[in-house]
A protein has these predicted regions:
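Glycine-rich, basic loop-to-helix element that forms the pyrophosphate-binding segment
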Residues: 63-81
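Cell-envelope/extracellular polymer assembly enzymes that use nucleotide-activated donors
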Residues: 4-6, 33
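A conserved acidic beta->alpha catalytic loop
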Residues: 38-47, 66
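Conserved donor NDP-sugar-binding/catalytic core segment of glycosyltransferases
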Residues: 94-118
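Short, acidic, metal-binding catalytic loop of nucleotide-sugar glycosyltransferases
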Residues: 23-32
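Short aromatic/hydrophobic "clamp" motif used to bind/position activated sugar donors
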Residues: 86
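Acidic donor-diphosphate engagement hotspot in glycosyltransferases and nucleotidyltransferases
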Residues: 21, 45, 74, 82, ...
Length: 118
């Protein structure tokens, strides 16, 4: 069995793209955890994540009462994850069903490295 992947999304006023992003992540191979860390959105982001969380236990929402910034929010997502592989996903990214699993497999074949998608 391949090591699990945690997808970490930092959102701020991302309601217009987050629903589609979460749908695709939920369908992606080997995604064990989906963490959405929100930096005090007021555009309906919470309702979108709650709907996905009620349908899929892998989705968890971390709501910040203010906007601590992108890096701090990513660190919160990491702290809430248990998976050995982390994927930092922007809320407007639409991942393919195999993309993250293939990146992980490539990284495993290369040894210690960092990969990205262009």
């Amino acid at each position: 069995m391949s090591p699990a992947i945690a997808a970490i999304i930092v959102s701020y006023q991302s309601a217009s793209t987050l629903d589609a992003c979460l749908l695709r992540l939920r369908e992606a191979r080997d995604i064990a955890e989906i963490r959405v860390v929100d930096n005090d959105s007021t555009d309906g982001t919470l309702e979108i994540v709650q709907r996905h969380a009620s349908a899929d236990a892998r989705v968890r929402f971390i709501a910040n009462p203010d906007n601590p910034g992108f890096a701090a929010a990513n660190n919160q997502g990491v702290a809430d994850s248990q998976a050995p592989w982390l994927a930092f996903i922007n809320p407007d990214l639409m991942v393919g069903p195999e993309t993250l699993a293939l990146l992980r497999e490539r990284a495993l074949s290369l040894g210690d490295c960092v990969l990205g998608v262009e």
